[in-house]
Curated annotation (Swiss-Prot):
Its EC number is 3.6.4.13. It comes from Xenopus laevis. A motif (Q motif) lies at residues 95-123. The keyword Signal does not apply. It comes from the Eukaryota. Keywords: ATP-binding, Cytoplasm, Developmental protein, Helicase, Hydrolase, Nucleotide-binding, Nucleus, Ribonucleoprotein, RNA-binding. This is ATP-dependent RNA helicase ddx6. Gene3D superfamilies: P-loop containing nucleotide triphosphate hydrolases. ATP binds at A139, K140, N141, G142, T143, G144, K145, S146. ATP-dependent RNA helicase that is an integral component of messenger ribonucleoprotein complexes (mRNPs), storage particles that mask maternal mRNAs from the translational apparatus during oocyte maturation. The keyword Ribosomal protein does not apply.
Length: 481
């Protein structure tokens, strides 16, 4: 059965006959992402965006801090996140962001993001990156990797120079938008730090026009930035730092040659930072060729997030939708992401979910870019509880309201499984991963358990809400009634 090319993002089945529609959600802005709705709408009008700097300058001028003032009193802090956190993010050395001698304007942006103290990956990365040394960092999904490289990147900018000084390469368009939003928010008090996102699927001419103005930081997908470099539009001869986020994907066969071509255009004394949850042989080869005495960070004693509880349910293919309906009726879902193995199955499942009476978005790579942007933006802002998607949505995407991930189709690769379930349990919070397993999936299930050194348990008749529902926990450890 074929499915036509998707022309519009679909909000499916906005009925309220089930318990899932309880008004708009407001995901908290945590260390992996977030941002104001206005910023996100502006970002998503075009996939390639640049902050003007004028707003940031105005903010800085309106809240000038004189020496000796208690500058922290002027900060507009978000509500404190009282959800329980696991040792993935709490097992730190006790450092403070102020220990790294960062610019006060940068510290203001950090604290206003709600980042109170550095996570383990940030503690390890920030001082080394500030020293100018290359880094090979391995850390779990959702533990603060974006902050680990954006903070030193912004600290090292010289805003007096009218040139691109840093570049962040990511594998997907949605991740590029997310990282650029974080970068703009963290740098908003720096008075003129200009950040541009550029991705494929958007108007190249718009990017060329934006690069005529001052740009300090470029956040891009590989193909688009290489195109701009080859056209002589993106001048990269003054770049001092390049970051490869999700390095294992960027150095896979899909992107390897493009990444090699990009690296060859950069100055020889540039700093390279590699971040990923997994490091296959391709990453090791790249490190040997291009990194100079890299500082290696490995915070991966175990691969899966401590806060994610994993279950499986044995079903036939025909029972999957019925099983999903049962899960929807019994689980207390804040937001869920449901993975399928093909674009066609994504659309078919989204239609089925809407027929069951549940609200549902879907997203996959065959959709037009502006529609992907809108779905990403609206789901992140809590306009819908459930998102059906392909593996397009597994890389780095940080939506902290997601507490349940369902593998409607079980993946074949351990790496894919790891990235999928990492969409819940972000930044040390709790989450649930449920896998629908057919007879043909049973060998993959066993293999993935062995490769990841994890246990995927049979699903019980009733799942304890303390395992995945945020409001059942507080920092004091007391359960709410």
């Amino acid at each position: 059965m074929s499915t036509a090319r998707t022309e519009n993002p679909v909000l499916m089945g906005m009925s309220s006959q089930n318990g899932q529609l309880r008004g708009p959600l407001k995901p908290s802005a945590g260390p992996g992402g977030g941002g104001t709705q206005t910023q996100q709408i502006n970002q998503l009008k075009n996939a390639s965006t640049i902050n003007s700097g004028s707003q940031q300058q105005a903010q800085s001028m309106s809240s000038i801090i004189k020496p000796g003032d208690d500058w922290k009193k002027t900060l507009k802090l978000p509500p404190k996140d009282l959800r329980i956190k696991t040792s993935d993010v709490t097992s730190t050395k006790g450092n403070e962001f102020e220990d790294y001698c960062l610019k006060r304007e940068l510290l203001m942006g950090i604290f206003e993001m709600g980042w109170e103290k550095p996570s383990p990956i940030q503690e390890e990365s920030i001082p080394i990156a500030l020293s100018g040394r290359d880094i090979l960092a391995r850390a779990k999904n959702g533990t603060g990797k974006s902050g680990a490289y954006l903070i030193p990147l912004l600290e090292r900018l010289d805003l007096k120079k009218d040139c691109i000084q840093a570049m962040v390469i990511v594998p997907t368009r949605e991740l590029a938008l997310q990282v650029s939003q974080i970068c703009i928010q963290v740098s908003k008090h720096m008075g003129g730090a200009k950040v541009m996102a550029t991705t494929g699927g958007t108007n190249l001419r718009d990017d060329i026009m934006r690069l005529d103005d001052t740009v300090h930081v470029v956040i891009a997908t590989p193909g688009r930035i290489l195109d701009l470099i080859k056209k002589g539009v993106a001048k990269v001869d003054h770049i001092q730092m390049i970051v490869l986020d999700e390095a294992d994907k960027l150095l896979s066969q899909d992107f390897m040659q493009i990444m090699e071509d990009i690296i060859m255009t950069l100055p020889k004394n540039r700093q390279i930072l590699l971040y990923s949850a997994t490091f296959p042989l391709s990453v090791q080869k790249f490190m040997t060729l291009h990194l100079q005495k890299p500082y290696e960070i490995n915070l991966m004693e175990e691969l899966t997030l401590k806060g994610v509880t994993q279950y499986y349910a044995y079903v036939t293919e025909r029972q999957k939708v019925h099983c999903l309906n049962t899960l929807f009726s019994r689980l207390q879902i804040n937001q869920s992401i449901i993975f399928c193995n093909s674009s066609q199955r994504v659309e078919l499942l989204a239609k089925k979910i809407s027929q069951l009476g549940y609200s549902c978005f879907y997203i996959h790579a065959k959709m037009r870019q502006e529609h992907r942007n809108r779905v990403f933006h609206d789901f992140r802002n809590g306009l819908c509880r459930n998102l059906v998607c392909t593996d397009l949505f597994t890389r780095g995407i940080d939506i902290q309201a997601v507490n349940v991930v369902i593998n409607f189709d079980f993946p074949k690769l351990a790496e894919t499984y790891l990235h999928r379930i990492g969409r819940s349990g972000r930044f040390g919070h709790l989450g649930l991963a449920i896998n629908l397993i057919t007879y043909d999936d049973r060998f993959n299930l066993k293999s993935i358990e062995e490769q990841l050194g994890t246990e995927i348990k049979p699903i019980p008749s009733s799942i304890d809400k303390n395992l995945y529902v945020a409001e059942y926990h507080s920092e004091s450890g007391e359960d709410k009634p």
